[in-house]
Curated annotation (Swiss-Prot):
Bridged cysteine pairs (disulfide): C20-C479, C58-C290, C71-C83, C106-C151, C294-C318, C486-C490
Family: Belongs to the influenza viruses hemagglutinin family.
GO-annotated biological processes: clathrin-dependent endocytosis of virus by host cell; fusion of virus membrane with host endosome membrane; fusion of virus membrane with host plasma membrane; viral budding from plasma membrane; virion attachment to host cell
Extracellular side of membrane: 17-527
Stored InterPro entries: Capsid_hemagglutn (IPR008980), Hemagglutn_HA1_a/b_dom_sf (IPR013828), Hemagglutn_influenz_A (IPR000149), Hemagglutn_influenz_A/B (IPR001364)
Function field: Binds to sialic acid-containing receptors on the cell surface, bringing about the attachment of the virus particle to the cell. This attachment induces virion internalization of about two third of the virus particles through clathrin-dependent endocytosis and about one third through a clathrin- and caveolin-independent pathway. Plays a major role in the determination of host range restriction and virulence. Class I viral fusion protein. Binds to sialic acid-containing receptors on the cell surface, bringing about the attachment of the virus particle to the cell. This attachment induces virion internalization either through clathrin-dependent endocytosis or through clathrin- and caveolin-independent pathway. Plays a major role in the determination of host range restriction and virulence. Class I viral fusion protein. Responsible for penetration of the virus into the cell cytoplasm by mediating the fusion of the membrane of the endocytosed virus particle with the endosomal membrane.
Gene: HA
GO annotation, cellular component aspect: host cell plasma membrane; membrane; viral envelope; virion membrane
Pfam families: Hemagglutinin
Protein's UniProt name: Hemagglutinin
Amino acid sequence: MERTVIALAIISVVKGDQICIGYHANNSTKQIDTIMEKNVTVTHAQDILEKKHNGKLCSLKGVKPLILKDCSVAGWLLGNPMCDEFLNAPEWSYIVEKNNPINGLCYPGDFNDYEELKHLVSSTNLFEKIRIIPRNSWTNHDASSGVSSACPHLGRSSFFRNVVWLIKKNNVYPTIKRTYNNTNVEDLLILWGIHHPNDAAEQAKLYQNLNAYVSVGTSTLNQRSIPKIATRPKVNGQSGRMEFFWTILRPNDTISFESTGNFIAPEYAYKIVKKGDSAIMRSELEYGNCDTKCQTPLGAINSSMPFHNVHPLTIGECPKYVKSDKLVLATGMRNVPQKKKRGLFGAIAGFIEGGWQGMVDGWYGYHHINGQGSGYAADKKSTQKAIDGITNKVNSIIDKMNTQFEAVGREFNNLERRIENLNKKMEDGFIDVWTYNAELLVLMENERTLDLHDSNVKNLYDKVRLQLRDNAKELGNGCFEFYHKCDNECMESVRNGTYNYPKYSEESKLKRKEIDGIKLESMGTYQILSIYSTVASSLALAIMVAGLSFWMCSNGSLQCRICI
């Protein structure tokens, strides 16, 4: 009867009022990595790596790209007859050229410093084509017979639209001396060429003069070209070759042409009306009737994220390219929902075993149980402070990283392969550095965020512990058990930091003495029971040993001698 009373008293102590410090949990399956751990499930996270694109070529900030389709830049600028739709191209945001456009130099040959020309074009947004030397001004030369089956138009032989192939007239090719003064306020892009015949017979047939030359001069250019007559294999049905040149004529500068044959004269030039952040992108995509701030060869990216892994070449205001597959910033805390079998007061912060899915209005808070019931209450002050800090950190990272960043491909001619390889290695190295920096940044910030949450929960726990002092007992799982009755008003005072320790200290003191007395009485009772149990067990063992010995002596299994 006495033991029953003691047990009931102990149970009544365990059922005392309690308050627990805990943290939010939810059904999130988002995972992040830290310096120390991988695949940590958190309540909230923000992806900062864009992986998607729309698979289309789009306008860039409302300005359409110049998509050259099957034409190359050379075919467009010289006026390949198959590129007539681009003769008067409107303003463009960027230029799109296929990897292997079929309509380039229809008459076989070469474009001198072509890569530099493309670099110039890539920093231009608008050309205005103007006539500088009219075709009908060549009265002493044939300006209409210079056509080729290699450049057909509507089934007939034709030639590049923006230049004139001059042929002898009446078996005479008078020396050409022409000048043009740039009276415009803009720079002019001027194109011309020279024809290299297959043999001397073709040279005489077209130009009469066997020792021809083409000279071009400006304030910065002094060039003299001589036809290279040689036997060559046919390309596009032609054994001859054409070599094209270009220059930029500054305002108020003059260009002079002198030639005794083989001259491909400029008829039109390009006024560079608008310079800007353009580029030449290689892509096989079609225009998608869309608008974007960032374009890649694979499609447009519309994202505010600071990083992407779509394609290393971009045009516009783009995130930075990294090779990573995953960059996720933790904005919440570890998501460890409390296991039901542990009950409500199970045991982040090193001592709390699980989060509360019932607390939905804050990251950290309290759960209480008393005679008036139980409930959750978030600590909104510490939650808001943490949210503001993490939000500012994430925004700061995005703002610092998400600046305009372009990475357009550079082209090199066949003599510059070593430079091209070196350039590629350098660009790959930069990408590797960016990738490493981005991944390290995320890992470090995630570690700091989780540590911040642990620290905030621990601070909340210490705030309660310092208020309650010896008016409550620490249960070791984030909970405190009061030595006094604590109604809802009392619980609220603990939560808001106004707990009145002296008010409850006397009641707590009496309760502690009562519990200590029960423990002492219980200890005495259990000591008596322990002694009784030990003596009884020893006596029973002695009787068993004696009985076994007597039985063995009686049947001869054991010799018994009694000495007096």
